[in-house]
């Protein structure tokens, strides 16, 4: 009897193991099926900036899960230049420079049938592979309490940020670390002109607490009170405005910054990726992008009774940025900013502090010394000379220029300090 019982238990145990294994296989198969339909979207935006859109998409019948890879533009370039590229299907970014790079390296699929309202916002050179689904604008994120503690009014524009009263109160990123910041810097250079634009940036540099590694890092640091104000794109600011200490104000001449979407040529889920883009461009998708939770504006015009319609119209009415020029002088602007500001920030702050102190003591401006601290070693004509700009693709040429600029800035700063000492 015991033998029969043991054999029965043994048989049941084997059936149980087989059943459990079958259930495990079924679960794994189901999981793999779900994973195989997952879209991987690489993006330069922060997770909070994409969460609302993805949540709403995933309530749609037949929608697939979206997993995001949130990285800098430079990091995504490196990732997507590799063979497997982590099986990325989509790119969501405000960086035309990233999309231009990917297109030149044959990484993007062709897209067609985009609405005219979308395509007119896309730089001509990437219109065959990219569509604009939303727009943003540039402005200043303000920490009211941080400024109030220093008895300072909020700055209204780039010019205000260079005032001596804002010493140690400002934050920004750099063009080499953030394409969003690059576009903001270019909007200033194109608005004011090359020479005046750099003079403004160099005056601001004396007031910076630090250079943030990410554009949304500027917003996070201002929220924490590390700085009182800084230039950001509106969608990062809008997501923080439930904090009563924070406010956002657009620059008077804020350029429009589109949000682009593109499909990777080697996407394993190209149909699903295109379905997501069609959803974003559909009336329903545009209504979701009009929601303040995204911090963006749709490309389709908002109705006149929408409280956000007036600002959308103001953004759309601004002259478009010269994207051809931005792409041609990308290396120049990035290297100039780092050489002029990022790599010598501590010395710059000392020099500007000395100048402001001297002007206060003497009760008069010192334009000659100020000119030494606000000049750059490249003239406006060269900044638009495509033949000369193309040489920056040669690493040796670019590094040689940076060495020359370092010496130029150092000599100017030494001369400025010498002249200030003579005034004592």
Which residue stretches match the model-derived regions?
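Periplasmic-binding protein-like
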Residues: 118-122, 136, 170-173, 200-205, 242-269, 279-300
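A bilobed periplasmic-binding-protein/Venus flytrap-type ligand-binding module shared by bacterial periplasmic
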Residues: 141-146, 256-272, 288-289
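C-terminal non-catalytic accessory extensions
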Residues: 351-424
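Extracytoplasmic ligand-binding site segments that recognize negatively charged/polar headgroups
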Residues: 51, 87, 95-99, 103-212, ...
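Early extracytoplasmic/lumenal segment of secretory-pathway proteins
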Residues: 35-101
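Short helix-initiation/N-cap motifs at beta->coil->alpha
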Residues: 69-79, 206-220, 256
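A ligand-binding cleft/hinge motif common to bilobed small-molecule-binding domains
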Residues: 96-101, 223, 227-245
């Amino acid at each position: 009897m015991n033998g029969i019982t043991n054999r029965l238990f043994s048989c049941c145990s084997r059936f149980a193991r087989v059943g459990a294994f079958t259930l495990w296989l079924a679960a794994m198969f189901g999981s793999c099926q779900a994973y195989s339909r997952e879209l991987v979207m690489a993006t330069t935006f922060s997770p909070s900036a994409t969460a609302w859109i993805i949540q709403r998409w995933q309530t749609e019948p037949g929608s697939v899960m979206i997993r995001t890879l949130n990285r800098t533009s430079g990091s995504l370039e490196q990732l997507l230049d590799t063979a497997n590229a982590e099986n990325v299907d989509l790119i969501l970014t405000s960086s035309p420079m990233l999309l231009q790079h990917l297109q030149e390296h044959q990484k993007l699929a062709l897209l067609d049938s985009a609405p005219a309202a979308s395509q007119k916002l896309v730089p001509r050179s990437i219109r065959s592979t990219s569509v604009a689904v939303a727009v943003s604008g540039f402005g200043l994120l303000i920490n009211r309490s941080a400024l109030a503690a220093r008895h300072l009014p909020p700055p209204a524009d780039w010019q205000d940020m260079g005032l001596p009263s804002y010493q140690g109160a400002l934050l920004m990123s750099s063009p080499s670390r953030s394409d969003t910041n690059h576009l903001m810097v270019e909007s200033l250079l194109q608005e004011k002109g090359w020479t005046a634009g750099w003079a403004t940036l160099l005056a601001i540099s004396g007031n910076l607490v630090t250079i943030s590694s990410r554009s949304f890092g500027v917003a996070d640091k201002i929220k924490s009170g590390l700085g009182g104000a800084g230039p950001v794109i509106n969608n990062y600011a809008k997501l923080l405005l439930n904090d009563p200490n924070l406010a956002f104000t657009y620059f008077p001449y804020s350029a429009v910054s589109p949000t682009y979407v593109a499909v990777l040529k080697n996407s394993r889920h190209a149909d699903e990726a295109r379905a997501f883009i069609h959803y974003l461009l559909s009336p329903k998708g545009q209504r979701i992008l009009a929601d303040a939770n995204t911090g963006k504006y749709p490309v389709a015009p908002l109705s006149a009774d929408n409280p956000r319609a007036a600002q959308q119209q103001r953004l759309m009415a601004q002259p478009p940025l010269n994207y051809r020029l931005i792409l041609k002088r990308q290396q120049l602007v990035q290297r100039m900013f780092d050489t002029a500001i990022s790599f010598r920030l501590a010395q710059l702050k000392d020099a500007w502090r000395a100048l402001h102190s001297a002007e206060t003591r003497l009760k008069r401006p010192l334009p000659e010394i100020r000119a030494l601290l606000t000049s750059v070693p490249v003239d406006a004509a060269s900044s638009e000379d495509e033949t000369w700009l193309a040489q920056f693709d040669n690493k040796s040429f670019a590094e040689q220029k940076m060495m020359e600029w370092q010496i130029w800035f150092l000599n100017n700063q030494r001369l400025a300090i010498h002249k200030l000492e003579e005034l004592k």
